[in-house]
């Protein structure tokens, strides 16, 4: 008898939770369609991970794209990953480079790392040790420790002129980022 009560309780609770998830999902979709960035990100992640919905990479790409077009670096990074690995899209490094670049320019260390790797490997962009090193250094300075090792390995493959050029580009990039941050603060 206790097992039957426990089973019925579990069924009632799971049905209630399922109905609540469906209601929450519909509410999120409504907000996302209205351009709500947080809802778009939450829906994209739900579809990417299969949380509360059936995993659907194509739908995740749709919602990440809408959020990325609003300038969200997390969505841009995720689109880079999805294009790199062919999740919901045909694998293609060129759009991956586009999305990684947009996120990397906003200071996303994982996007900077992946962008540096693509420049090193020449995938989606011409092989370029200078840019690979520059992005590896940025990722490292933004807390991604693996890129410090990559930057050092790249230095061994580079000429002194290439290292100097990478350092110059890195400084230019940092100045540009600081100026952008300052302008954004003034506009708030």
Spans of features found by a protein language model:
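TPR/TPR-like alpha-solenoid repeats
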Residues: 46, 67, 82, 103, ...
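Terminal, low-structured helical/coil segments at or just beyond the last alpha-helical repeat
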Residues: 145-188
């Amino acid at each position: 008898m206790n097992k039957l009560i426990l089973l019925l309780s579990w069924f009632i609770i799971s049905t209630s939770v399922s109905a609540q998830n469906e209601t929450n999902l519909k509410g999120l979709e409504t907000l996302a369609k209205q351009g709500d960035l947080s809802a778009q990100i939450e829906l994209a992640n739900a579809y990417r991970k299969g949380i509360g919905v059936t995993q659907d990479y194509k739908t995740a790409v749709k919602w990440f794209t809408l959020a990325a077009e609003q300038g969200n670096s997390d969505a841009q990074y995720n689109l880079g990953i999805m294009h790199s690995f062919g999740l919901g899209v045909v694998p293609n490094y060129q759009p991956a480079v586009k999305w990684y670049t947009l996120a990397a320019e906003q200071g996303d260390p994982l996007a900077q790392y992946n962008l540096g790797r693509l420049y090193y490997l020449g995938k989606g962009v011409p092989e370029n040790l200078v840019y690979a090193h520059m992005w590896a250094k940025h990722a490292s300075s933004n807390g991604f420790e693996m890129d410090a090792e990559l930057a050092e390995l790249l230095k061994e493959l580079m000429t002194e002129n290439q290292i100097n050029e990478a350092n110059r580009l890195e400084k230019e990039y940092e100045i540009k980022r600081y100026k952008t941050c300052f302008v954004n603060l003034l506009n708030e």
